[in-house]
Amino acid sequence: MNPFHASCWNTSAELLNKSWNKEFAYQTASVVDTVILPSMIGIICSTGLVGNILIVFTIIRSRKKTVPDIYICNLAVADLVHIVGMPFLIHQWARGGEWVFGGPLCTIITSLDTCNQFACSAIMTVMSVDRYFALVQPFRLTRWRTRYKTIRINLGLWAASFILALPVWVYSKVIKFKDGVESCAFDLTSPDDVLWYTLYLTITTFFFPLPLILVCYILILCYTWEMYQQNKDARCCNPSVPKQRVMKLTKMVLVLVVVFILSAAPYHVIQLVNLQMEQPTLAFYVGYYLSICLSYASSSINPFLYILLSGNFQKRLPQIQRRATEKEINNMGNTLKSHF
């Protein structure tokens, strides 16, 4: 539920009316906004909801939770927060940009969505740093890499995300535009306010964490290559070479980071491009909505990446299902005994 969406919606009709074929352009925009986009977001919402609930349930029910499990569980929770706002976004799109759920819910949904952006970026960054220490310097900061400390770190990241999202809690509200449509938007009337807020959100959620994430993985790749060369020269197994399980976890986190970059980069680039545009073009309008779909799609893709890339999840799912079945059978047995 991005605050920029409402302004984009209201400029789209005017923009398309100036295109080659007014009637065709208007009909196309209407179909895209009220049918195609809501349908796409609806599919993403359904898939992501099931997948992320499955991941959270699997980790919570696991007897042995690792440090990466805690980070992945928090990412899944963040994705669920992201998905919670999707039905409201679908409804607003389907009604031509009109918000009918009232001001308080507009503020809550918009603020939680922004908070999720901060949380995802922060968790992804800290998880990348954790992978660096687990792989390259496993004996450093060991007292911080415990399950208890990791839970506290993640709680701190969530608290910081709520604080960073305070401007959205204050300024997001239902706004009535010139065409009479009331939309849930971010009430920034000054161009300077729009500029500073866009830079603030883009830098803190993408351009600041991105270099940290990339540095961590460049160092990991350099270390892995160095260990490979040492093994090749010595023609033996070096005990300092990372274990296969650590490498699998690192590979999984690396793929998650790549998905994070590919899904978030288009949206943030378009936000910066918008600052330089006096009148959005049709290409910008289409690109903006595609970037929205990409950002939401990552919430659906992530849980399946956890399952496909992590051997632990593939082993845990049948075990948890078996334990749940056994528990259900025992409960049925106890119920039958109580009746006889």
UniProtKB/Swiss-Prot annotation:
Which tissues is it found in, per the record? Answer: Specifically expressed in the brain, with highest levels in cerebral cortex, hippocampus and amygdala. No expression detected in the cerebellum, thalamus or hypothalamus.
Q: Which InterPro entries match?
A: GPCR_Rhodpsn, GPCR_Rhodpsn_7TM, MCH_rcpt, MCHR2
| Entry GO terms, CC | plasma membrane
Q: What is the recorded phenotype of mutating R63K?
A: No changes in receptor binding or functional signaling
Subcellular location(s) per record: Cell membrane
A single MF term (Gene Ontology): G protein-coupled peptide receptor activity
PROSITE patterns, A to Z: G_PROTEIN_RECEP_F1_1, G_PROTEIN_RECEP_F1_2
The consequence of R152Q is: No changes in receptor binding or functional signaling
User: Per the UniProt record, which residue ranges are transmembrane?
Assistant: 40-60, 70-90, 105-129, 155-175, 201-221, 253-273, 289-309
Provide the topology term for how it sits in the membrane: Multi-pass membrane protein
Q: Which residues lie toward the Cytoplasmic compartment?
A: 61-69, 130-154, 222-252, 310-340
Q: Which PANTHER family match?
A: MELANIN-CONCENTRATING HORMONE RECEPTOR 2-RELATED, NEUROPEPTIDES RECEPTOR
By what name is this protein known?
Melanin-concentrating hormone receptor 2
